[in-house]
Amino acid sequence: MAEAAEPEGVAPGPQGPPEVPAPLAERPGEPGAAGGEAEGPEGSEGAEEAPRGAAAVKEAGGGGPDRGPEAEARGTRGAHGETEAEEGAPEGAEVPQGGEETSGAQQVEGASPGRGAQGEPRGEAQREPEDSAAPERQEEAEQRPEVPEGSASGEAGDSVDAEGPLGDNIEAEGPAGDSVEAEGRVGDSVDAEGPAGDSVDAEGPLGDNIQAEGPAGDSVDAEGRVGDSVDAEGPAGDSVDAEGRVGDSVEAGDPAGDGVEAGVPAGDSVEAEGPAGDSMDAEGPAGRARRVSGEPQQSGDGSLSPQAEAIEVAAGESAGRSPGELAWDAAEEAEVPGVKGSEEAAPGDARADAGEDRVGDGPQQEPGEDEERRERSPEGPREEEAAGGEEESPDSSPHGEASRGAAEPEAQLSNHLAEEGPAEGSGEAARVNGRREDGEASEPRALGQEHDITLFVKVKLTALGCSRIAIKKYLRAGYDGESIGNCPFSQRLFMILWLKGVIFNVTTVDLKRKPADLQNLAPGTNPPFMTFDGEVKTDVNKIEEFLEEKLAPPRYPKLGTQHPESNSAGNDVFAKFSAFIKNTKKDANEIHEKNLLKALRKLDNYLNSPLPDEIDAYSTEDVTVSGRKFLDGDELTLADCNLLPKLHIIKIVAKKYRDFEFPSEMTGIWRYLNNAYARDEFTNTCPADQEIEHAYSDVAKRMK
């Protein structure tokens, strides 16, 4: 708690007797209502006035559901059984002795700058030092609801209000349960200690603060102008923070903290801000939190601003409301316009972050009574979010919408497709982003997408990565007109788009029943081809270059190779395979097989040869065999997107029709394929083995 330095050396002033447990909040409309008059430097009566800087907890949020979330266990503990008074203690300050024991244990400590054990409450705000005129306070008191009376000292957790003359410092220690009450002027400090756990720090206006602690961390914070504060703690979890003006009364500390009048089930958190940044905090069940803001700050001449007049009208209209509603309205009158509330809820912490409330928002939506008790305010809805769920008013704030948007999992843009959509030979498009929906393919552009891309290819989509770009890719349909067709060039573009992490639409095309719209789109062109923002791209090599240039870092990964020789590695393998599989003459088969093996051995040598970045110039060990996963390193590149689909076809078709397999001694090729089969970008874009075999059924004829 921010503590102001206390002036010393000022003569003590008259002190009031401690007989009165706590000042009682007067009824609205009566002269001298709570918060209506400021106490002067002289003539302070302990039996009639509350200490300076205390705010009426009953009035500013002690009787309603508004309770602060800041239940803070103070660090001050003591077990003193004797009463002491320092020199300079005012004669009027009476210290009860052992005969005046209360039923609870209580410890009072002065909140001097040296007391660092006291935790500093959050949300503490300073006010302007000037007191507003008495008529203003009386007028505000008339607007507030009836306040139930309570006592400040009694049983366990009782609070002690004490103030001394300017600069005086009073320390009093008494037996268990003794209470100390003293009143004085600005800057006075009273320290009184009782049994372990209870403590009270009291100061007057201009930096004075009062803190009282009860069992298990219950607390009440009431702050006045320029940092005045009162902290009183009650049962575990319940806390109230309230701020008022100089001279306002504070009531806190009935048996076991009941006098705090939390009014909300344990765990609720309410934050309400008053004039000049004052705040009220209270906690309730299940981490529910609420902050109220909106009362205008009064001008220096005592006149109410237009916002205050509007609040007066609202208060007038509140006649006939329940006491809880009126208490809520009274709490709202202690707020500053423009102060934005925030909810804080976390499991076990009763903290929740929420958006901002504005005066005049739509009606509040209330959850069930099992969750929390909340009163509706005429000012508008209050934020209602909990750790287990949320309820928002129709006029939810931008922060609320942003939080909801943030709550949407980014996993929606996943790198895997959960299901396979129907591949229509008639050219129907399917969105490839892991969350396909009916009619999505016909959308011109998905939310947040930069481009509209359609890829017409020949393979069926089983999974794809996703990002911000919608691509339409047209695939060649399989032999049944719907399933994946075999085409290494289509899979090449598939892999590139997946590795780039983009959203794109895929359309399979049945070449026997090619739709008229596709013929008009790319006349005389067979898949694969692509449309990018309406522009048709038909050449596979140019599409690859275009995508690498258009979808460039830093947003999209670079897929180009670092070593130029990786681009040409294995470029003759597929040609040798085609000659080998198409040959039907037995006498020529051996020659074609040797040519294929030669090309494969060349590729295997490159895969086993270490790349320059694999060789450590400072290492004493020579690297003779590469351990990289792919052609250009451990990551897939454009070269892999070109070569891997071809190697996969060779492996399937050669075994099926020529009983040919890659030799086991070609460790580089097998390591390369095994690493590729471990990547979804490759395996999930491969056509089925049956589709590949069917595609070569006419080509791979029996040898004669």
UniProtKB/Swiss-Prot annotation:
Iron-sulfur as UniProt keyword: no
Keywords: Cell membrane, Chloride, Chloride channel, Cytoplasm, Ion channel, Ion transport, Membrane, Oxidoreductase, Phosphoprotein, Repeat, Transmembrane, Transmembrane helix, Transport, Voltage-gated channel
Tissue: Expressed in brain, placenta, pancreas, liver, lung, heart, kidney, liver, spleen, soleus muscle, and brown fat.
Biased composition (Basic and acidic residues): 67-83, 121-147, 350-360, 371-385, 434-446
Top class in the EC scheme: oxidoreductase
Motif (G-site): 487-490
Region described as 13 X 10 AA tandem repeat of G-D-[SNG]-[VIM]-[DEQ]-A-[EAG]-[GDVE]-[PRG]-[LAVP]: 157-282
Ranges annotated as biased composition (Polar residues): 295-306
Compositionally skewed regions (Acidic residues) per UniProt: 39-48
Listed Gene3D superfamilies: 1.20.1050.10, Glutaredoxin (3.40.30.10)
Sequence ranges assigned to domain GST C-terminal in this UniProt record: 556-704
EC number annotated for this UniProt entry: 1.8.-.-
Low complexity bias spans: 1-13, 90-100
InterPro entries (alphabetical): CLIC, CLIC_N, Glutathione-S-Trfase_C-like, Glutathione-S-Trfase_C_sf, Glutathione_S-Trfase, Thioredoxin-like_sf
UniProt PTM: Phosphorylated.
Activity regulation info: Channel activity is redox- and pH-regulated. Inhibited by IAA-94.
Its membrane topology: Single-pass membrane protein
GO molecular function, one term: oxidoreductase activity
Modified residues (Phosphoserine): S44, S397, S442
Keyword Transmembrane included in the entry's annotation: yes
Domain notes: The active G-site contains a monothiol Cys-X-X-Ser motif which mediates glutathione-dependent redox catalysis.
Subunit structure: Monomer (soluble state). Interacts with dopamine receptors DRD2, DRD3 and DRD4.
Summary of the function given for this chain in its UniProt record: In the soluble state, catalyzes glutaredoxin-like thiol disulfide exchange reactions with reduced glutathione as electron donor. Can insert into membranes and form voltage-dependent chloride-selective channels. The channel opens upon membrane depolarization at positive voltages and closes at negative membrane voltages. May play a critical role in water-secreting cells, possibly through the regulation of chloride ion transport.
Protein name: Chloride intracellular channel protein 6
Source organism (scientific name): Homo sapiens (Human)
